[in-house]
Amino acid sequence: MTGSDVNDPRAKLTPGIYDAGEAAMGIKHLFLLKKPSAFQLGSENPDDPKVQKILAQISNPSEVAKAPKGVQLVIAQLAFANSDLAFQGNHLFQGNFYGLNIFDISNPGKTSLLTSMVCPGGQNDVSVYKNLLFMSVEMANGRLDCGTQGFPPAPPPAKPLEKDEKPAPPPAQKDRFRGVRIFDITDIKNPKQVAAVQTCRGSHTHTLVTD
């Protein structure tokens, strides 16, 4: 086994979000398309009210408050991270913790955004079969209606009725969703949620198996 090679072109690549250095073999970078603004946190300030609002929606506020400010910012950015890709014909489906973007890739060098659908819940991994799109949801800000408002903090658990009895958990939010969403994408520019299958702990990712 050999160690790192300083002459490897990858060893001197410059960092960057959109302008990082590149080194490739057998593949060519054709195009860069940034995420739509709705899928970006839009702040580098951990004390920004928007950042704190997102943190409250996706995590335990009392716990995340103990984390360093830089870590808090990274956690908030995760709520807008891209996840899995799915392909069908000339369409690319990009899952994102905050929803879904659909692209026309008929000409890869001129890839264009067709549809953006805000639907928080993470991880939002996607699979496509015929006219149906399946999306995994596991985070605390997932709602049946794809809303962005999240939920108020859960009330404290009820006091135990008897000695040594565990306190009852707070009631579940009726609009919260964790599981697998199913969308009809017959109209590729207007996906419609046609089913939402709740699971015990939500769905981090999934595998689509057909007959």
Question: What function would you assign to each model-found segment?
Answer:
Residues 1-211:
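Feature marking well-ordered beta-strand scaffolds used for ligand recognition
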